[in-house]
């Protein structure tokens, strides 16, 4: 049985968010780095830095906090395509989350990108997760 690394990072971020942690440490792979880069660019996390410990690479992500409040933003992270049930979509059928307010992360032939980028380029792919 293999590990589902995408579900692991989504669960780590969700658990850190619920426990009001400021940072979360995630094992680093190429796919994970691409997803975290998208989350950083879209504003769901505040900062990311690479960390190496015992010859293993990690990403330390700082979660985004509300101004003048103690809690973090409540992000809903949902895994759509999983190892037991892959979900693919063409460019016309990529789902919109909350009318375009949320994002869908896809794995395409041109790399990992958001639903907006995939629609602009006119390509589809595997729907990895949704965030709103």
From Swiss-Prot:
Q: Which N-terminal stretch is annotated as signal sequence?
A: none
Query: Per its UniProt record, what InterPro entries does this chain match?
Result: Ribosomal_uS8, Ribosomal_uS8_CS, Ribosomal_uS8_sf
Keywords in UniProt for this one?
Answer: Chloroplast, Plastid, Ribonucleoprotein, Ribosomal protein, RNA-binding, rRNA-binding
Q: What are the subcellular locations of this protein?
A: Plastid, Chloroplast
- Pfam families the UniProt entry points to: Ribosomal_S8
Biological processes annotated in GO: translation
Which Gene3D superfamilies does the UniProt record give?
A: 3.30.1370.30, 3.30.1490.10
Which domain of life does the protein's organism represent? Answer: Eukaryota
In its keyword annotation, does this UniProt entry include Ribosomal protein? yes
Q: Does the keyword GTP-binding apply?
A: no
- Annotated Gene Ontology MF terms? rRNA binding; structural constituent of ribosome
Q: Which GO terms describe its cellular component?
A: chloroplast; ribonucleoprotein complex; ribosome
Q: How does it assemble?
A: Part of the 30S ribosomal subunit.
User: Family per UniProt?
Assistant: Belongs to the universal ribosomal protein uS8 family.
What this protein is reported to do is described as:
One of the primary rRNA binding proteins, it binds directly to 16S rRNA central domain where it helps coordinate assembly of the platform of the 30S subunit.
Name of this chain's protein: Small ribosomal subunit protein uS8c
Q: Which lineage?
A: Eukaryota, Viridiplantae, Streptophyta, Embryophyta, Tracheophyta
């Amino acid at each position: 049985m293999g590990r589902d690394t995408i579900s692991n990072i989504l669960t780590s971020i969700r658990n850190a968010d619920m426990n009001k942690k400021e940072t979360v440490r995630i094992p680093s792979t190429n796919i994970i780095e691409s997803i975290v880069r998208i989350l950083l660019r879209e504003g769901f996390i505040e900062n990311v830095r690479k960390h190496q410990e015992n010859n293993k690479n990690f990403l330390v992500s700082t979660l985004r906090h509300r101004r003048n409040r103690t809690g973090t933003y409540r992000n809903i992270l949902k895994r759509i395509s999983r190892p037991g049930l892959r979900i693919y979509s063409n460019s016309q059928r990529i789902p919109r989350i909350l009318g375009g307010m949320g994002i869908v992360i896809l794995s395409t032939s041109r790399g990992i990108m958001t639903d907006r980028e995939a629609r602009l380029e006119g390509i589809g792919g595997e729907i990895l997760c949704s965030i709103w």
